[in-house]
Design a protein with these regions (language model features):
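Residue-level signature of catalytic and energy-coupling elements of molecular machines
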Residues: 40, 58, 87, 101, ...
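Walker A/P-loop phosphate-binding motif and the immediately C-terminal alpha-helix
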Residues: 147-185, 298
Length: 399
């Protein structure tokens, strides 16, 4: 444990509740401290993914009996030290603490939260502890549970980023701990599509990903600004990916999506080298000019240790009144699937066909994934159902 006060200091030796049938009721405030501390150990910091007690954020719990017990039996003050002043998730953490205290079953408690920020020394120790646990790229360690999908396309304009955003939002809405990296350094778009205009929190050189619509995000656009052109050569691109993987505290997500740049350039090679357990999802539209190029993006798997999980055909049709219009033709996704299956020597399925819908653009450009309602729950549209099927197929498939 880093900093903070241990469980034994709150009167719960050996992990017990500290309360039994022989409880000395005059000593009950001390017993309450122990049980409240245990309850707070289940409150998880949403950025770091660890218990606030393990992180040393709980510095004291003070329990005082009330004279007037009309509304509560005890006043409980929880003293909390957050990582930095103005922590963006301060309200989320304090709400969870209040919930843990107010739902205490053995007495009626009125909670008060005193919030401060960690000292520089304590924060340095915490960051050192977190870095020691991680050391380097966390997605290559043995036994990693995270499924990693690199979303690729042969050319731009096929809706690859829209597919990435809506797939990530769907996975998060289904309950998966979801992370996404905007690996399209020159053409970054995830911040706008997720409605993000803030920079990641910097904890002494370790970055906390920005969370939007339940998805943990990182993008060069969060640092460069939307009006700046990125002019980097290959080695700098590779270094940016390494930093996104190693210098960002991801926790242990269930799934990581990478929105690749179109084509088969430096970043595609860097992803394959840095994440050899990643799986490629190829996005195309139906017309041959897109599908023929998409095949080449999948053939990267012949030269690097990456498996192609499947193909997504985007903009497959447009429903207008009673007409089912195939604006970009038909069959492109299946052609890519067939050609990659033959070339790679294993089955590369057509995972999904997605309709062309104006809402993907209009809602997406407002900063909300089109598969979600304004409250963040999954929409009941045909598009959302297709993304749900795609998400479940990807997560259920054997890697």
């Amino acid at each position: 444990m880093v900093g903070g006060m241990g469980q034994e200091q709150f009167g719960t030796e050996n992990g017990g509740s500290g309360v039994n049938d022989q409880t000395d009721w005059e000593d009950f405030p001390r017993r309450i401290k122990g049980e409240v501390f245990e309850r707070l150990s289940k409150v998880i910091d949403p950025e770091l993914g660890r218990s606030i007690t393990d992180l040393g954020m709980i510095t004291d719990i003070v329990v005082v009996p009330r004279r007037d017990t009309t509304e509560a039996d005890y006043d409980v003050t929880v003293r909390v030290e957050l990582t930095i002043k103005g922590c963006p998730l301060s309200q989320t953490i304090t709400n969870q603490i209040n919930g843990a205290v107010s739902s205490y079953p053995r007495a009626r408690l009125h909670s008060r939260i005193d919030v401060a920020s960690m000292s520089k020394e304590k924060l340095n120790n915490l960051v050192a502890d977190l870095k020691a646990a991680r050391r380097s790229n966390p997605f290559t360690k043995p036994g990693i549970k995270t499924r990693i999908f690199a979303i690729a396309s042969g050319k731009g304009g096929v809706g690859k980023s829209s597919v990435t955003v809506n797939l990530a939002a769907t996975l998060a809405a289904l309950g998966y701990d979801t992370a996404a990296i905007d690996a399209d350094i020159y053409g970054f778009s995830l911040p706008n599509l997720f409605g993000v205009d803030t920079q990641p929190t910097n904890l002494n050189g370790m970055l906390m990903p920005v969370t939007a619509w339940g998805v943990k995000l990182i993008s060069i656009g969060m640092f460069a600004g939307s009006d700046r052109a990125i002019l980097w050569r290959g080695p700098r691109l590779q270094r940016s990916l390494e930093q996104f993987l190693s210098d960002v505290w991801w926790g242990d997500p269930d799934v990581l999506l990478l929105d690749l740049a179109p084509g088969t350039g430096d970043m595609a090679l860097s992803v394959a080298q840095a994440l050899p357990n990643s799986e490629l999802v190829v996005v195309t539209t139906p017309q041959p000019s897109a599908s023929d190029v998409a095949v080449r993006s999948g053939l990267v798997a012949l030269q690097v240790p990456t498996r192609v999980r499947g193909v997504v055909e985007n903009m497959s049709w447009y429903d207008h009144q009673d007409e089912h219009l195939e604006i970009f033709g038909s069959g492109g996704g299946q052609r890519v699937s067939d050609q990659l299956t033959e070339a790679l020597g294993y089955q590369v399925p057509l995972l999904a066909q997605l309709p062309l819908q104006p809402e993907v653009r209009t809602v997406g450009e407002s900063g909300r994934p089109a598969v979600l309602k304004p409250d963040g729950s999954l929409d009941d549209s045909d598009l959302a159902r297709r993304f749900v099927d795609l998400a479940r197929t990807l997560m259920s498939a054997t890697s």
